[in-house]
Amino acid sequence: MLKDEIKTQEQFEKGFAEFKKKYPEYKDAKPIERLNLIMRKEFAMQILKGEKKMEFRAFSEHYCNRLVDKDTSNFMNKYFGTEHEDEVFFYANYVRPVKVIHFHNYSNSWHLDVECERNDFVTLTDGDVKFLNEEYGCHELDDMLNDFNKRKEENRPLFFYFSCGKVIDTNLQL
């Protein structure tokens, strides 16, 4: 089953199970138990107060080295440019799922540990920003998107995103 044929979560799960049978060498990206991220205290306080639900990081070499599963990426690259490319790139995801994010400053004088509900990457396009708006109520990229659209920029940046869940531990005070 491909993207155009899938309308429900059940259909996706069935298609994904078929995909895994067809490609037994495929392995899900290895999860990251705890991801350390440097953050300014004001943003950590916004998360603690429930005002900020999303965190973004540039799709840079630094974060790709930390967040991209090399084995899954190699599997996907094997099918790049083949007749199986669409199917493989639809089901396979090389972004390593993060379980907990440990936000802190450079000196580690404070920390904020939060559950990561979901992480992946987005492109600064109308569709991806609309997804963030509707799925998470996140409007942090709206102004940047409008600026790129006004300038008719074709090369759009990518970002890793993290949906922040419940606070697990912190030494910050409200």
Regions found by a protein language model. Give the residues of each.
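Structured alpha/beta reader/binder surfaces that contact nucleic acids or chromatin modification marks
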Residues: 2-174
